[in-house]
Amino acid sequence: MTTQTLLIELLTEELPPKALNNLGNHFAASVAEGLEKAQLVDGAAEFTAYASPRRLAVQVKNVKAVQADQKIVKKGPAVANAVKDGTPTKALEGFARGAGAKIEDLTIIHDGRQDVYAYEYVQTGRPLGGLLEDIINQAVKKLPIPKVMRWGSSTFTFVRPVHGLIVLHGGDVVNVSVLGLQSGNQTLGHRFLSDGEIIIENADSYAAQMRGQGKVVASFAGRKAAIQTALEGQARRLNATVAADEALLDEVTALVEWPVVLEAGFEEHFLAMPQECLILTMQQNQKYFPLLDQNGKLMNRFLLVSNLQTEDPSHIIRGNERVLRARLSDAEFFYKQDQKATLESRLPKLANVVYHNKIGSQAERIERLQSIAAHIAKALGADAAAAGRAARLAKADLVTEMVGEFPELQGTMGKYYARLDGETEEIAEAIEQHYQPRFAGDKLPESKIAAAVALADKLETLVGIWGIGLIPTGDKDPYALRRAALGILRMLMQYGLDVNELIQTAFDSFPQGLLNEKTPSETADFMQARLAVLLQNDYPQDIVAAVLAKQPRRLDDLTAKLQAVAVFKQLPEAAALAAANKRVQNLLKKADAALGAVNESLLQQDEEKALYAAAQGLQPKIAAAVAEGNFRTALSELASVKPQVDAFFDGVMVMAEDAAVKQNRLNLLNRLAEQMNAVADIALLGE
């Protein structure tokens, strides 16, 4: 059966730029999935997604014009139950009626267990046109669109008004109706660079015709690559690097159909402002690409991506420079105004900034942060007074003009204003870094003072918000407590502090009775659960569970423990020791009295005497290895007692009739369990 390329295009008004690439990929994948399910392609569909500001399209290779005929076999009742005394039973008659067949049309087949009646027929394949309308409509319905709209007198809804529909199979139009539009082969090109309608001659010529006649690079990936190449080329010419992240590049790609990269500039005096402010203004407000020199310093040149190609782009450049100049002038004004007051003098204004109405203002919060940060700094061996000072000033920039205009600069502007106020560099850096880590993979605070303030900030948030009942549920976490917990955990894995003690310190900083009394224990459990999530990114679940079963309160040696358990798990003796440990734990649950020391005089059998001797010899070795942080050695020592453990369980009845002997054997197993689980609960390995 011959196949041809299928093309589908929805011509729209300008689509949301931040969602464009996702919409294009979802639409293409859904169409391809529909074709696969309808068996209009053999195997996995080979498709290309297209997405530009005014269109979503998909091109699928090797699509059939008609489904292949299918042999259908409907199975009915067993032969043994289908005929009685030569007469068809009601079961057989009902099957034939339901299948739309006569009894004489039925056949007998073997279904692998028995002979059954069956109705076999050939289902004629349906044409592409009879299936495609539903496939496209389903693809449209599945698009991840949070808000839809209606347009004109239409009752149909979509993310933006849709004005055209192309459906081509090879060079032939496939007649379908989608979103109230009849399919055709006409589309529009670039809004300004293209004239009139474009007739797509063939599904395979779509991208080339859109580029040549329409001045549209239809492929999102193609436009992005072209923009990136042009940006890098311009930057090299200026001996600079482009300051841009993937999100900005994606957004700009979604704003243009015919990208042209241009160079522009601004006055040097603006460089006196913090470069973070200038970069944010250019990237966020104007979608420009700032340039950095070889030392990472901002230049007064930038790159912009225009959607127009002209012989003389100077008017485009001047227009963009004029807009940016106005933006930077506003920022410069805010910056100068802010310098008229110190951070310290701004603190009273924090009383008017509500943190949460149940736990007070930012001014009240600052009091708590100071005490928590000073406590943590002291525990870290850092300057408690400096940490307290940094915490005192950490939120002062929230009431500055600059942060009011650019909230993303909180902390950063505090650093610059602290320097201007004569604060130490360590305090200034701590003010900026106390928000770190802001997200997964973000860097940690660089100094102990900064870490103390960062820990204080996140602990106070976690404990305070949790304590008033705003607990994360499902996908709802308005105060980002999960992120705060992960940030705390990452820092504690670097610094050897007791997580439960820190939680209690944060809890005690609030007025008595303000927070739920269960908050410390609940947040500790929450942290333990988040720790498991964090560690399972790098280690198998059973290894993480084994280490966390010990409920470690200091996390700075977690990585060493996890690595040691991973090595132990590979030992030949590991599986048997894990099973034995599980058996030991189950037996210990049956103890009638408190477990204590082993009484050597009650050891009766050679096997238990041998195990006791082995445990006695093992104890100092494991204790020394754990004390030195040599967890691999501690775990590897366990392999030496496997013969004695095996012999004990093979030859000794633990639950003896003599109560004293039974208790002594349980005491022995408890002694063994303490050593086996000194690093991790190895009974959990393999589960």
Swiss-Prot record:
HAMAP family: Gly_tRNA_synth_beta (MF_00255). Keywords: Aminoacyl-tRNA synthetase, ATP-binding, Cytoplasm, Ligase, Nucleotide-binding, Protein biosynthesis. Tetramer of two alpha and two beta subunits. PROSITE patterns: AA_TRNA_LIGASE_II_GLYAB. It catalyses: tRNA(Gly) + glycine + ATP = glycyl-tRNA(Gly) + AMP + diphosphate. It is an enzyme of class 6 (ligase). GO terms for molecular function: arginine-tRNA ligase activity; ATP binding; glycine-tRNA ligase activity. This is Glycine--tRNA ligase beta subunit. InterPro entries: DALR_anticod-bd, Gly-tRNA-synth_bsu, Gly-tRNA-synth_heterodimer. The lineage of its organism: Bacteria, Pseudomonadati, Pseudomonadota, Betaproteobacteria, Neisseriales. Its main location: cytoplasm. GO terms for cellular component: cytosol. NCBIfam families: glyS (TIGR00211). The keyword Metal-binding does not apply. Pfam families: DALR_1 (PF05746), tRNA_synt_2f (PF02092). Belongs to the class-II aminoacyl-tRNA synthetase family. It is found in: Cytoplasm. Its EC number is 6.1.1.14. It comes from Neisseria gonorrhoeae (strain NCCP11945). The keyword Protein biosynthesis applies. One of its GO terms (biological process) is glycyl-tRNA aminoacylation.
